[in-house]
């Protein structure tokens, strides 16, 4: 099955061979299968909370990616994202979460950081709404920004964030912004139109909430009102490899 724009962008953002990649995207295994092909030295872990879905993913993997050694390159789990057994698997980790709201994603990440306080791991995130809340949480965790960009699929616009959670509490070299920075640095007309539409959607959303008496929304509306869309040579802001 062909990947959509959003999953394709996620695959393209995995530019190094992690020892372990966790597909927590509620995507029927499509992303993880693409990463199995692209990163032959990585172990890909497929995670879903719904038993019937993970059973189907397991059968598909057995069919298309049969084990050739005693150590298969993929594993499947029926569990909550909060319960990922990161420390049971030595090496570098990338956790990919998409297809859920930024509020729920925030809960997942906070719990993962709490349960693995001495372990660095990367996160590749594509939330549905509530990105400001998610960014607040990532900033509180002292997350290191690697890249951020906008991607449009089926007339919906998503933020794609690649960050690293580090165990140290020292100064962060590339901290996140609450409203994004390189999201608004565009290199062509199409990107400019997407950025303008997305910014307008956010401004209108928080303006409506602020008019309803939401003090937090008033602050967010003002923050997005201050955003400027700028022309840039590179709109992905690849900071750290």
Identify the residue ranges that each predicted region occupies:
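Glycine-rich SAM-binding Motif I of class I
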Residues: 29, 33
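Gly/Ala-rich phosphate-binding loop of Rossmann-like dinucleotide-binding domains
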Residues: 36-37
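Local beta-strand N-terminus motif with an aromatic residue
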Residues: 18, 41, 92-93, 120
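S-adenosyl-L-methionine
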Residues: 52-89
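Class I S-adenosyl-L-methionine
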Residues: 2-9, 84-85, 93-94, 103-241
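Conserved class I S-adenosyl-L-methionine
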Residues: 18-27
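Conserved SAM-binding motif I beta-strand of class I
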Residues: 43-48
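Short glycine-rich anion-binding loops that position phosphate/pyrophosphate groups of nucleotides
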Residues: 27, 100-103
């Amino acid at each position: 099955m062909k990947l959509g724009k959003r999953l394709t962008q996620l695959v393209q953002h995995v530019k190094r061979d992690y020892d372990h990649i966790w597909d927590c995207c509620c995507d029927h295994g499509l992303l993880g299968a693409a990463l199995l092909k692209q990163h032959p030295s990585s172990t890909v872990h497929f995670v879903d909370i719904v038993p019937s879905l993970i059973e189907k993913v397991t059968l598909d993997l057995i069919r298309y990616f049969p084990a050739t050694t005693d150590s298969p390159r993929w594993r499947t789990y029926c569990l909550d994202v909060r319960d990922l057994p990161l420390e049971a698997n030595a090496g570098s980790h990338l956790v990919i979460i998409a297809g859920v709201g930024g509020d729920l994603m925030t809960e997942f990440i906070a719990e993962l950081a709490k349960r693995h306080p001495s372990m660095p791991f990367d996160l590749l995130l594509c939330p549905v709404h509530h990105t400001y809340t998610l960014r607040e949480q990532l900033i509180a965790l002292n997350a290191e920004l690697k890249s951020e960009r906008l991607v449009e699929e089926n007339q919906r616009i998503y933020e794609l964030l690649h960050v690293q959670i580090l165990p140290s509490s020292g100064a962060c070299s590339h901290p996140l912004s609450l409203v994004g920075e390189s999201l608004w640095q565009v290199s062509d007309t199409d990107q400019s139109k997407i950025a303008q539409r997305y910014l307008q959607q956010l401004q209108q959303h928080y303006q409506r909430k602020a008019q309803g008496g939401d003090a937090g929304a008033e602050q967010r509306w003002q923050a997005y009102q201050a955003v400027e869309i700028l022309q840039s040579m590179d709109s992905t802001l690849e900071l750290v490899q």
